[in-house]
Amino acid sequence: FDIRGVLDGPSFKPYSGSAYNSLAPKAAPNASQWLTTNNGNKTHTFAQAPYIGDSISKDGIQVGTNTANPQQAVYADKTYQPEPQVGESQWNASVSNNAKAAGRVLKSTTPMYPCYGSYARATNEKGGQSKNNDGVEMRFFASSANDNQNDPTVVMYSEDVNLEAPDTHIVYKPAVTADTISSELLHGQQAAPNRPNYIAFRDNFYWALYYNSTGNMGVLAGQASQLNAVVDLQDRNTELSYQLMLDALGDRSRYFSMWNSAVDSYDPDVRIIENHGVEDELPNYCFPLGAVGVVNSYKGVKQNDGNGWVKDDSVADTNDIAKGNIFAMEINLQANLWRSFLYSNVGLYLPDDLKYTPGNIKLPENKNTYEYMNGRVTVPGLVDTYVNIGARWYPDVMDNINPFNHHRNAGLRYRSMLLGNGRFVPFHIQVPQKFFAIKNLLLLPGSYTYEWNFRKDVNMILQSTLGN
């Protein structure tokens, strides 16, 4: 007979999509505005103005000149210009204090979110993202160093967009008053990627059934001294041993598409964390793109016939020279890669009682939801890296947590792909001949025994990388 159904509900989110702005620092804010109520409502702006134009007028930043006679300035189309990804093409491009610059900024009415993970869908054919093309406002800025000079040198195009974060969640949020969506404090928010959640069935059951021909059809097995088909799920070690035995004995792991029966398998470090000797000798440095330190502007001078110094007219007035060592940063790449692996593959799979909810973050009351499990974090020091010389180790809890629910499980990942990985997945399981039941199988409550019996080592539950 067949079992048909649909996987859906609050805990089902199969994968993490596109990872928008994944190169952005986890705490980098979007260019944004906010209001303060000190001395009346005042708008503050925090933004980058990457586009350098020829001039600024009441019409905005000049982006070119047309070929008419006489020639006329062409100003930015505010529905999509200036484009935020367009700026100076060289690291050494000279931008003077009087250069005319422009950029885009989010209005205070768009909720703040870190740049990491942010996504705003396009709303016009040019790629502009404003909710309302007529709602883009120009905000002009002049240097505050000269009180007598008010000519603008920067114009920011302020807009509201449909800001989403489909693949990330907030892990740090400063304390702000309720319903605050934009403020200076919220620039300090930090985002982290959502964990993938592969959902699949362990098996499609064909291989696990055998026929009981004793004539006791319809009779409870316990009454007829036969095998009882209502069995408990196996403990973790038995389950792992059985999977590895199947992998070693049969072809099931090779030809698994037919029965949706891919054998569970893992990266070795997910089960037993290994260190091989000490590999921590060489430091890693990074340097500025210009390969010099902080530069100052110098003019050329020459000796005046042995009597003091005078300006050298054969040398430019602005020579950029840095003194001393080049600034450099050191990072332990090896340790950070290992630390990141441990946190993502061990720390985030620790039991819930070893995790905590970040401050000021509101998670659902239902602990079985994807949003709750995904939002909980582990103290990094719990699985922090250290130089462990030539030894094998793992936290005790790893021996008590079912390792089959893990995003590095190739078998689960493949079976999840067969289901389609959609947000709502119809499934269809074909089972030979008769009804069956297994204790704790969510889809078939109750206990029944018919002529088809299960082997004692059944392996058929709905599994997910976030938990059964």
Curated annotation (Swiss-Prot):
InterPro entries: Adenovirus_Pll_hexon_N, Adenovirus_Pll_hexon_sub3, VP_dsDNA_II. The keyword Cytoplasm does not apply. Major capsid protein that self-associates to form 240 hexon trimers, each in the shape of a hexagon, building most of the pseudo T=25 capsid. Assembled into trimeric units with the help of the chaperone shutoff protein. Transported by pre-protein VI to the nucleus where it associates with other structural proteins to form an empty capsid. Might be involved, through its interaction with host dyneins, in the intracellular microtubule-dependent transport of incoming viral capsid to the nucleus. GO terms for cellular component: host cell; host cell nucleus; T=25 icosahedral viral capsid. The lineage of its organism: Viruses, Varidnaviria, Bamfordvirae, Preplasmiviricota, Tectiliviricetes. This is Hexon protein. Induction: Expressed in the late phase of the viral replicative cycle. Coiled coil: none annotated. It comes from Human adenovirus A serotype 31 (HAdV-31). Signal peptide: none annotated.
